[in-house]
Amino acid sequence: MRLSGAVRSFTDEDIPDSLLWAVLDSARFAPSGGNRQGWSVIVVKDPTLRRTIRDHYVVSWREYMAHVHAGLVPFAPKSDGSWHEPAVDLIAARLIPQPSEFADNLERVPVLLIVVVDLTQLAVTDNGLTRQSIVGGASIYPFVQNILLSANAMGLGGVVTTVITRQEEALRPVLRLPRPWAIAALVALGHPVRPVRRLSRREVSEFTVIDHFKGLPLVPGPGSPASTHTELGREPAGRGGQRK
């Protein structure tokens, strides 16, 4: 987990189906609500379809980056916990190029996966609350993360991106995706151009508190393995390797 950073640059080395199968064979043991396993994976090989996905991805990438350039978290809910309307002019954003080696060359990644989910199989226990729903993701994104962890264990690198979900309705016909299936993520895999760097993240005491949200931070006690990680050369806390 400490060495499974987002990888967006890959060599041209092909990934055989046998290796991809092995990656997914391990990833399938992810948890899901009621063990319903409502996911399916589309392995995109057709060159024309890959270019179509790239073109749609670029449009959503422009929307995403318009938020970033405005100093905003893309499509984030407001302080009341709900999303009301776009915070930027999306029509204008789609017309402004946002150069990205990954987005502009998406059709060339060795493995291009579209992870989809049957919405009727998600136990969305926060439905009806007066805030953005998040619980449904617990039944699909552990599987997506398992794909990355499994790939990493087999010498591959990868990245998950949800930007493509903005284009779900446009892609539904070309993917032959029926309702109530939805796009959960796009996953790119391959052999990394550069060695995967060690990750940096916030320390445990920065996000873990005792008894209540304003409680004291949890700190390592005697004999904690925290010091061992430092001795092994792990980087200090930070926010590197954020995903899109």
What are these regions (language model features)?
Residues 22-28, 111-174:
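Small-aliphatic-rich amphipathic alpha-helix that forms the alpha element of a beta-alpha
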Residues 6-7, 76-86, 182-244:
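C-terminal helix-cap and adjacent tail motif
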Residues 29-35:
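Glycine-rich phosphate/pyrophosphate-binding beta-alpha loops
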Residues 38-39, 109-112, 183-184:
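Short, surface-exposed beta-edge/turn micro-motifs
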Residues 29, 101-104, 173-177:
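A generic local secondary-structure boundary/capping motif
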Residues 43-137:
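Glycine/small-residue-rich phosphate/adenosyl-binding loop
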Residues 9-10, 40, 157-161:
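Short catalytic-loop micro-motif centered on adjacent basic/acidic residues
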Residues 1-13:
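Generic N-terminal amphipathic, Lys/Arg-enriched alpha-helix
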